[in-house]
């Protein structure tokens, strides 16, 4: 073993040790010392603000960084992105997987299922003009996957300069919805530019390939019992679907030539698949819920008004270092960003995912109640995806998986936790579903999502494939009561043991003097 090898190993260990030690470092420019209404006693590490990128980007991206609350995972950093395009990642921070969650009554509470149990979590409002991010010019808002990923790559380069203790971390990117476009493009750029050590991506209910969604909407509705195959309504919607699919096929350049035909198809579904057409519709993000037409879920989740008021509060904006001269209030989704986000390269995303699968693990997970980006479209996408020299999964069987973190649900379901969904993993690609969950899985089932993503980060799904051990449900007695019951049990067990031992000795002494009867020979 050479001296140079030993020195390299020692240097790497020293770098990792210093990195872990530096994670407790406070960066005053971005450090958040307190936030209004945060639970007393909360001591988590929080930094937020901007990296002063205006000279390069003609605008700036807003970030929120929560430090890991698990010493084992201090050198793992997870980027979370919400979709839209143009929807703020503060949704993910305060309604899904951040350590501080907001209720419908504007109460902030500690989220015990936060991903800070698995590493540092970095939420970024992007592209520019989204959430607390801002754009100084109209051109800065004009976006497509290429410009968006370039802007984000520059942000990430500057981030690890400002926070060098994170530069050598193991990084992951996760998100949902239109982040199915963001994440593959960003991941490819990060890997090609070697900005950080990107070790995997996870996309929830992702908008990845438009054709996969439009082609499977009716199949999903039939599978969920909302539409009858062969009915007059099914046939009518199939005719509208055909026009939408034709416009996609004719779009050789990757741009929708007749986008209205696909919009009409979606609107016709929402209008007509209802017991009271034109009055109520199913929630497109959770088909088990109903909404007034034409909202159809746009007002969901219910906490949105409270979140808007909370984040728009001058005290909160000041605490988070928001540029109040650029952003007057927080907006969940920007219609301006959405309208100016071009469809260029949207149709190439599945090919990008195929390329990424040759280098890093990818997980596609789906809340089963989501219509807009549903699991049937995910299955169709995978079955037509080519990677590692093969098309789709070779093995057609799926396995149930179980939430290892879901203590509350374990008790609810009795001795064993119920299966949370199905999972399948081959050749670096994992497909998983989460039952009774919406478009925003961590919002509905934070513990189940924590278990699933933990297994993905650890690259060890065996921890969620085995049925959990039986759970003993202890009545809610006082400590003294429990102590007395335990002591009584110990005394009873000791008494029974003593009796058994005495009986055994007594019987043994009676039979010790007897000589066994010898068998007579034949």
UniProtKB/Swiss-Prot annotation:
Question: What are the GO MF terms of this UniProt record?
Answer: serine-type carboxypeptidase activity
Q: Which residues are glycosylated?
A: 52, 75, 104, 197, 395, 428, 436
Keywords tagged on the record? Apoptosis, Carboxypeptidase, Glycoprotein, Golgi apparatus, Hydrolase, Membrane, Protease, Signal, Transmembrane, Transmembrane helix
Which reaction does this chain catalyze? Preferential release of a C-terminal arginine or lysine residue
Main EC class of this protein? hydrolase
Q: Name one GO cellular component term.
A: membrane
Lumenal side stretches: 23-478
- Tell where it localizes: Golgi apparatus, trans-Golgi network membrane
Database matches in SUPFAM superfamilies: alpha/beta-Hydrolases (SSF53474)
| Stretches of the chain found on the membrane's Cytoplasmic side | 500-522
Function field = Protease with a carboxypeptidase B-like function involved in the C-terminal processing of the lysine and arginine residues from protein precursors. Promotes cell fusion and is involved in the programmed cell death.
Task: Family membership, please give it.
Answer: Belongs to the peptidase S10 family.
This chain's protein is named Pheromone-processing carboxypeptidase kex1
Organism expressing this protein natively: Schizosaccharomyces japonicus (strain yFS275 / FY16936) (Fission yeast)
User: What phylogenetic lineage does the species belong to?
Assistant: Eukaryota, Fungi, Dikarya, Ascomycota, Taphrinomycotina
Q: Name the gene that codes for it.
A: kex1
